[in-house]
């Protein structure tokens, strides 16, 4: 499914930290969504890492933390620092280092920024980076990424009640699929204590309301001389 000619040879990489992965995702995203301000300054890059929307998990990192992570990414050649501006600016080098086409980069970027996604979610959320014709084309590129000698993504076990499998990036290391399946199953079958207490309170409120309405009906029936029990037997 690789449609990009002369794709560079991929390099083996160490596992990234969560912040390093976030930085890579932000740089690719902003290259497409705000091209006029790309490459990004340290301030803009930090803001992108701490962005509240289209991020999972939401982070709160400092410029010093981003600078440290950038040093690691520059050592891996995943990020380059420009020298033509008084303000240091940073750009990604994902296509050359990983040796994957732009379509695959778009999907990987969404996984880096938003966490596990279904193929349908990836198609929707990657629209500003690349427009996929259909879900099958998304799955084809995901399959390629998963089949590499050093896989970049993995298909997760389907959660109970879910219609589709989700995909997860492996840039931060391998995941234990059995643990992931157990976590999904536990999340589907159990109710958090706070939610359970809220349900109990709502049940009591409804029971009290039914009792109040029942008493009101009996009182009104008595005032009108209606025998409620007789009416019930007749029905």
Curated annotation (Swiss-Prot):
Stored InterPro entries: DUF480, WH-like_DNA-bd_sf, WH_DNA-bd_sf
Which family does the UniProt entry place this protein in?
Belongs to the UPF0502 family.
What is the name of this protein? Answer: UPF0502 protein Bcep18194_B0081
């Amino acid at each position: 499914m690789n449609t990009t000619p002369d794709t560079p040879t991929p390099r083996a990489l160490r596992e990234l930290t969560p912040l390093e992965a976030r930085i890579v995702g932000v740089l690719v995203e902003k290259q497409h969504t705000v091209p006029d301000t790309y490459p990004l300054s340290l301030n803009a890059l930090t803001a992108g890492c701490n962005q509240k929307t289209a991020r999972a998990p939401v982070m709160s990192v400092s410029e010093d933390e981003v600078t440290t992570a950038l040093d690691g990414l520059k050592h891996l050649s995943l990020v380059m620092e420009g020298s033509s501006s008084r303000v240091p600016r940073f750009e990604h080098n994902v296509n050359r280092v990983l040796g994957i086409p732009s379509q695959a980069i778009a999907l990987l970027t969404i996984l880096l920024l938003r966490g596990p996604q279904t193929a349908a979610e990836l198609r929707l959320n990657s629209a500003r980076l690349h427009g996929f014709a259909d879900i099958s084309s998304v799955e084809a590129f995901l399959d390629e990424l998963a089949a590499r000698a050093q896989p970049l993504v993995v298909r997760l076990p389907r959660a109970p009640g879910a219609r589709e499998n989700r995909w997860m990036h492996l840039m931060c290391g391998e995941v234990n699929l059995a643990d992931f399946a157990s976590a999904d199953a536990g999340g589907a079958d159990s109710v958090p204590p706070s939610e359970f207490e809220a349900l109990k309170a709502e049940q009591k409120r409804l029971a009290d309301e039914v009792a109040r309405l029942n008493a009101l009906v009996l009182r009104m029936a008595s005032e009108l001389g209606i025998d409620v029990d007789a009416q019930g037997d007749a029905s």
